[in-house]
C-alpha cells in the first residue's frame, strides 16, 4: 500500500490492516524458518506497510 492510500483510511481500518499485516508477517517468518518461503521480498514489503500504518496512526494522534 502507498502512504496516500493508508492516510485515506479511517483509524479502525488502519488498525485492522495493521493486524492483518502482522499476522501475515508471522506466517511469512514461519515459512522462512521451515524453508517454504519462495518470495523473500514479501517480508520487507509487509514490514514497510506496518511501519507506514504506524506512522499514519501517530500523525493522526498528534494532529488531534
Swiss-Prot record:
One of its GO terms (biological process) is translation. It comes from the Bacteria. Belongs to the universal ribosomal protein uL29 family. Signal peptide: none annotated. The keyword Kinase does not apply. PROSITE patterns: RIBOSOMAL_L29. One of its GO terms (cellular component) is cytosolic large ribosomal subunit. This is Large ribosomal subunit protein uL29. Keywords: Ribonucleoprotein, Ribosomal protein. GO terms for molecular function: structural constituent of ribosome. Pfam families: Ribosomal_L29 (PF00831). Gene3D superfamilies: 1.10.287.310. The lineage of its organism: Bacteria, Bacillati, Bacillota, Bacilli, Lactobacillales. The keyword Ribonucleoprotein applies. It comes from Lactiplantibacillus plantarum (strain ATCC BAA-793 / NCIMB 8826 / WCFS1).
Amino acid at each position: 500500500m502507498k502512504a496516500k492510500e493508508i492516510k485515506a483510511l479511517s483509524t479502525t481500518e488502519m488498525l485492522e490492516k495493521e493486524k492483518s499485516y502482522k499476522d501475515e508477517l508471522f506466517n511469512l517468518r514461519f515459512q522462512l524458518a521451515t524453508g517454504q518461503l519462495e518470495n523473500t521480498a514479501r517480508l520487507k514489503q509487509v514490514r514497510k506497510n506496518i511501519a507506514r500504518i504506524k506512522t499514519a496512526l501517530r500523525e493522526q494522534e498528534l494532529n488531534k
